């Protein structure tokens, strides 16, 4: 692990990293998040009886949109031309939660970790938003990077 923050310049100021001279490589990142809720809330989602419609479909699209907008949300992220964004949601009734996984890919000069994390986080937030009328104490947890490939720092996997 490096001991230097790449987004801090020699004067100690935040700046956007210059990737001009970096090579274009295939890059991929996977992230996850969980949202825990009451069994009744999860059953409402799973049965499709939620009055706001298909919660998973809405959360999936929100996660995809969020990945594409990451540089608008996180100030020092580069705008990226993503070639793939995938968001998967899996109800886990045995744990009263939804497991959210995201995948982002591109051919570029910088990684897609933040895009994958943003996709998973936003999908979880969307589930919360759609279900808050029936339950306000849902818990979003374990948002983390699972894997990244490509670039100078190589392969990382939890």
Curated annotation (Swiss-Prot):
Organism lineage string: Bacteria, Pseudomonadati, Pseudomonadota, Gammaproteobacteria, Alteromonadales
PANTHER family membership: MOLYBDENUM COFACTOR BIOSYNTHESIS PROTEIN 1, MOLYBDOPTERIN COFACTOR SYNTHESIS PROTEIN A
Name assigned to this protein: Cyclic pyranopterin monophosphate synthase
Source organism: Shewanella piezotolerans (strain WP3 / JCM 13877)
Known pathway: Cofactor biosynthesis; molybdopterin biosynthesis
Gene responsible for this protein: moaC
Positions with a binding annotation for substrate: 76-78, 114-115
Reactions the enzyme catalyzes: (8S)-3',8-cyclo-7,8-dihydroguanosine 5'-triphosphate = cyclic pyranopterin phosphate + diphosphate
NCBIfam families found in the cross-reference section: moaC, PRK09364.1
Family that this chain belongs to: Belongs to the MoaC family.
Top-rank EC class of the record's enzyme: lyase
Keyword Transferase attributed: no
The keyword Lyase belongs to this UniProt entry's keyword annotation: yes
Function: Catalyzes the conversion of (8S)-3',8-cyclo-7,8-dihydroguanosine 5'-triphosphate to cyclic pyranopterin monophosphate (cPMP).
UniProt xrefs under HAMAP family: MoaC_B
Domain of life: Bacteria
Subunit structure: Homohexamer; trimer of dimers.
Active-site residues per Swiss-Prot or TrEMBL entry: 129
Keywords in alphabetical order: Lyase, Molybdenum cofactor biosynthesis
E.C. no: 4.6.1.17
């Amino acid at each position: 692990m490096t001991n230097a923050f790449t987004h801090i310049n020699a004067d100690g100021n935040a700046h956007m990293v210059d990737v001009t001279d970096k090579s274009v490589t295939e890059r991929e990142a996977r992230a996850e998040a969980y949202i825990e809720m009451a069994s009744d809330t999860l059953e409402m989602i799973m049965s499709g009886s939620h009055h706001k419609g298909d919660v998973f479909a809405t959360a999936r699209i929100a996660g995809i949109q969020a990945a594409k907008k990451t540089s608008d949300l996180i100030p020092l992220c580069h705008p990226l031309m993503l070639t793939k964004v995938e968001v998967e949601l899996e109800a886990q009734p045995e744990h009263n939660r939804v497991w959210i996984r995201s995948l982002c890919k591109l051919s570029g000069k910088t990684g897609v970790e933040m895009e994958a994390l943003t996709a998973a986080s936003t999908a979880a937030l969307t589930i919360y938003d759609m279900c808050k009328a029936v339950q306000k104490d849902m818990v979003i947890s374990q948002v983390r990077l699972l894997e990244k490939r490509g670039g100078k720092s190589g392969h990382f996997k939890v």
